[in-house]
């Protein structure tokens, strides 16, 4: 049997007037009456349709629990903690770790917005803590391990000859600088490189969101260009930069890690986490890293937390 909701689902009175602009929202505004303006803010911020639909569904669930007509100023952190406890333990509907994390992101984003527009003096969701068990942390390269990998990437020879193979170091540095995924790397073409300013080359990455291709630009280190030029002379890429199978590049990374003596297998995923961690340690903002990695707000909630935990663990080891 489904546990009854702690509060009645009160409908908004018919005579209530919904706010038409964010400035109209005050602490006495009913919870449900703020949702449309919040959705408009998400659209303005360029959030995907998927994110907007998911956030809206999460807020509808909060309204069902809290009461649609509850004034937003009456909602405290204890109410939100009760919502998550009910969601995990009081509903006869399974709540996966991913769903829990997304709803946490929804509430934090929503109440932060209400605070920023001046509707709330304090953000009741600011102190919410993720309680659902996180997925295991990925392995990540420490600064010393990255240096070892760079050194080992320079020890390969081209087609078992005497000339150095330029691909391992070029690939390694590309992944460490950009954090792109395996499928994104395989889709790169020479036209993906924007070299209008040699001092600040840019990589254009195309990625797919719900069958729609989008594009993000990632700054490249100018020191990477000579590596690419050497690679281009050796491999002469035409249609795509990496004219081989994805499995072949996986072998290249694995061999780099083996030669460097890593205690784990170097992969695209580990390279991606290492890139994010390096940016975090360099003082880049959360939004910068999120956009660079091509993540949604929902995905970033968990990813950002993991990056901070990885940073903490390396720091404790003096790395």
Where do the language-model regions lie?
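Short, basic (Lys/Arg/His-rich) helix/loop patches that form interaction surfaces
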Residues: 158, 251-291, 295, 309-318
């Amino acid at each position: 049997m489904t546990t009854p909701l702690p509060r009645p689902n009160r409908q908004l009175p018919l005579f209530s007037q919904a706010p038409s602009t964010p400035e109209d929202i005050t602490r006495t505004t009913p919870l449900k009456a703020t949702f449309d303006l919040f959705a408009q803010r998400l659209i303005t911020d360029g959030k995907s349709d998927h994110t907007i639909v998911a956030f809206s569904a999460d807020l509808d669930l909060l309204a069902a629990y809290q009461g649609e007509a509850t004034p937003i100023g009456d909602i405290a952190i204890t109410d939100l903690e009760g919502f998550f406890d009910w969601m995990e333990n009081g509903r006869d509907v399974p709540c996966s770790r991913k769903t829990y994390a997304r709803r946490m992101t929804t509430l934090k984003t929503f109440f932060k917005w209400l605070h920023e527009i001046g509707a709330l003096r304090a953000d009741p969701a600011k102190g919410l803590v993720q309680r659902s068990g996180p997925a295991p942390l990925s392995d990540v390269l420490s600064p010393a391990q990255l240096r070892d990998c760079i050194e080992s990437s320079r020890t390969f020879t081209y087609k078992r000859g005497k000339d150095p193979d330029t691909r391992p170091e070029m690939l390694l540095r590309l992944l460490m600088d950009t954090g792109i995924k395996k499928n994104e790397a395989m889709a790169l073409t020479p036209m993906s490189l924007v070299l209008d300013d040699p001092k600040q080359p840019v990589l254009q990455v195309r990625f797919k969101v719900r069958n729609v291709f989008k594009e993000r630009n990632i700054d490249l280190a100018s020191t990477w260009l000579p590596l690419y030029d050497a690679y281009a002379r050796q491999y002469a890429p035409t249609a795509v930069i990496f004219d081989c199978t994805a499995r072949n590049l996986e072998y290249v990374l694995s061999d780099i890690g083996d030669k460097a003596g890593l205690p784990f297998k170097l992969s695209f995923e580990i390279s991606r986490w290492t890139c994010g961690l390096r940016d975090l340690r360099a003082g880049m903002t959360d939004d910068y890293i999120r956009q660079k990695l091509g993540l949604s707000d929902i995905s970033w909630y968990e990813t950002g937390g993991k990056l901070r935990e990885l940073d903490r663990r390396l720091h404790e080891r003096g790395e």
